[in-house]
């Protein structure tokens, strides 16, 4: 039957050379300039041709990359390309925030982000906020005033221990981002190394909690080009590695505590390329520190190098830079394509911002 037939139909067509393609394209342009009409000149400083041939791939080492294998160009997971759907909650009242969290969890969200007030932090506050939320079933992310991140970490660990959770299984993050504060405010505050050390010590029992943040979303929302966001983010992450390894902390431990928050612009194909390049470049940056593998792991590199430490943890959020005020429902289309590019690129979690974020407090419809 035809269904069982495995004929190679391409053999019925004679091969077409690049020169023949160009002749056909030039003829169809009817005298228009090929470079001006069809070649895309990106803001990143390189040109994208309208078609590519096998010869364009010659010499590229990345074409043999596989998912889940160093340097993780095609993702850090071998078997799937799943991502977590995250929603942000600004906590004004812990009881109300808890009710909202439970509601959106029932609607399919599997990652929560709480922005909590530092002045109100105590054990009762955490218990009220997380009541009936299974910390082993959902990723929990927290941010607060940078001077109170260690206190927040200690309260969370105490709460998880009180609830008798297996802390080695819990996934989440605490947003300590020393360099973002400098970027936003133009001045240093506190001792990064001392705070980071205290934070790593406080979360030692939470190996899957990332607590050193690279918030490149700030750059994206300020209108940076993709290459700028990528370059600064990698330098930012490397600065954590450099200072903390110099302070005596193991490279593998530091790398496994860093999380990257990127924005997603509407530049569809280059956003896919950005996330893929970010993973590959970060893997090589971490590898340059020769992180030592401290357990029996099949993902070891040469000389007992910890390849797991080189996996970049990425959260992505649709950009607010290009949201429009005057026809806000257009933002639904923009955020949809932005989210799709991040999903195809293999991010770990994603926030799609409400379409009316620029002018109104989000309601149930816009959050959905």
What are these language model-derived features?
Residues 224-230, 265-277, 319-332, 360-368:
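Short glycine/threonine-rich loop-to-helix capping motif typified by GTGT followed
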Residues 280-285:
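ATP-dependent phospho-/nucleotidyl transfer catalytic cores
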Residues 3-267, 271, 292, 297-300, ...:
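Catalytic alpha/beta active-site cores
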Residues 305-317, 326-353, 363-368:
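Flexible glycine/proline-rich, aromatic-decorated loop/lid segments
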Residues 278-279, 296:
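Helix-loop-helix hairpins and the membrane-proximal interhelical loops
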